[in-house]
């Protein structure tokens, strides 16, 4: 049986096309995915992301536990509210999930994990938390609204109260603060500035309506996917999964290698992969007609003339660039050109860094 978020009626009232997304009825779009995409790049849009799983961890040894559980190192989190992005690995260094962790206080950290991986994530965390005496609380009493775009923070602040505006006035990216009933974080999944706001379920509908009145446009899963793809942000199950190393998913920057004596789950295999080398994640741009799609093969010749093959992990038309883009996992040794087989045609593509748009502007690779 599919679940509904507390904002289901608001989506229907705005004419959303609803789809089943990992057991949740979620808006795909509200009439025009393209217009919603441009609204976020140029002004402000909002997404219902209440299907995401918020988990609060409590206990005196919570930091110690997370230093073992996560590949990134929460020792970096010294200022209350600071957040970081991390992979949670299995013993084979495959990615169980990617998540954001917030440091609230020394005995209180908050995780936000993916909805599709909820059950296995919770089971994995509970299994390893027991030895540290860490208590886990799933916050299904909270909704989550992401307000994103160059004008998103200004428009969101117009519906905050004075204390909430003061709380976020000088907040840097990747921080979160509890301000009254709202937990406001400067995080997102679009490559634009904005907030992700957790609030009690019973307040979500009214807050959504206030944002709507402030000129924030609702946006669905379709625009969320093209926005994150342009920004070069991974989607679990496509760029990485339990069989893919973070080193092959452009996530090396999220691994806390130092101090070298910190033992975290997956480290031993990760060190081997680091030495031997792995596949890598690259960007692809195709200016000819056609659309790069998931699972299409990517072929290229290496410096020795050997023909090698990788695969597109995410592909779509880019509304901002006006052409097709993709992320692809390929063997090391790829140059600046490759071909993608689309039906019976070998289409030339340019190989780039795995990011296409930053702050609303095309990235020059």
Curated annotation (Swiss-Prot):
Q: Name one GO molecular function term.
A: transaminase activity
Q: What is its EC number?
A: 2.1.2.10
Q: What class of enzyme is it?
A: transferase
Reaction(s) the record says it catalyses: N(6)-[(R)-S(8)-aminomethyldihydrolipoyl]-L-lysyl-[protein] + (6S)-5,6,7,8-tetrahydrofolate = N(6)-[(R)-dihydrolipoyl]-L-lysyl-[protein] + (6R)-5,10-methylene-5,6,7,8-tetrahydrofolate + NH4(+)
Biological processes annotated in GO: glycine decarboxylation via glycine cleavage system
Kindly state which keywords UniProt assigns to this record, in alphabetical order.
Answer: Aminotransferase, Transferase
Q: What job does this protein perform? A: The glycine cleavage system catalyzes the degradation of glycine.
NCBIfam families membership: gcvT (TIGR00528), PRK00389.1 (NF001567)
Q: How does it assemble?
A: The glycine cleavage system is composed of four proteins: P, T, L and H.
What is the protein name given in its UniProt record? Aminomethyltransferase
Species assigned in the record: Erwinia tasmaniensis (strain DSM 17950 / CFBP 7177 / CIP 109463 / NCPPB 4357 / Et1/99)
């Amino acid at each position: 049986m599919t679940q509904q978020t507390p904002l289901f009626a608001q989506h229907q009232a705005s004419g959303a096309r609803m789809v089943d997304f990992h057991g949740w009825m979620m808006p795909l779009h509200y009439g025009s995915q393209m217009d919603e995409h441009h609204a976020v790049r140029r002004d402000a849009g909002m997404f219902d992301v209440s299907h995401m799983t918020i988990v609060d961890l409590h206990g005196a040894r919570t930091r110690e536990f997370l230093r073992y559980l996560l590949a990134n190192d929460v020792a970096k989190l010294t200022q209350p509210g600071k957040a970081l992005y991390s992979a949670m690995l299995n013993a084979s260094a495959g990615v169980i999930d990617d998540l954001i962790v917030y440091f609230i206080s020394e005995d209180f950290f908050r995780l936000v994990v993916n909805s599709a991986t909820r059950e296995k994530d919770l089971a994995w965390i509970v299994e390893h938390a027991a030895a540290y005496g860490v208590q886990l609380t799933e916050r299904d009493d909270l909704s989550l609204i992401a307000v994103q775009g160059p004008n998103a923070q200004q428009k969101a602040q117009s519906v905050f109260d004075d204390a909430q505006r003061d709380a976020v006035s000088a907040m840097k990216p990747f921080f979160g603060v509890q301000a009254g009933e709202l937990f406001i974080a400067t995080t997102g999944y679009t490559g634009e500035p904005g907030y992700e706001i957790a609030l009690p379920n019973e307040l979500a509908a009214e807050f959504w309506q206030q944002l709507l009145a402030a000129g924030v446009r609702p946006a669905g899963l379709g625009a969320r996917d093209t926005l994150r793809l342009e920004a070069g942000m991974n989607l679990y199950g496509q760029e990485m999964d339990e069989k893919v190393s973070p080193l092959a998913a452009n996530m090396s920057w999220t691994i806390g290698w130092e101090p070298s004596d910190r033992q975290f789950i997956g480290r031993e295999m990760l060190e081997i992969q680091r030495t031997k080398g792995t596949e890598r994640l690259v960007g692809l741009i195709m200016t000819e007609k056609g659309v790069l799609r998931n699972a299409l093969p990517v072929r290229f010749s290496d410096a020795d003339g050997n023909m090698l093959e990788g695969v597109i992990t995410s592909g779509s038309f880019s509304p901002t660039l006006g052409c097709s883009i993709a992320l692809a996992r390929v063997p090391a040794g790829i140059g600046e050109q490759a071909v993608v087989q689309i039906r019976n045609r070998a289409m030339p593509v340019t190989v780039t860094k795995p990011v296409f748009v930053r702050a609303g502007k095309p990235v020059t690779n």
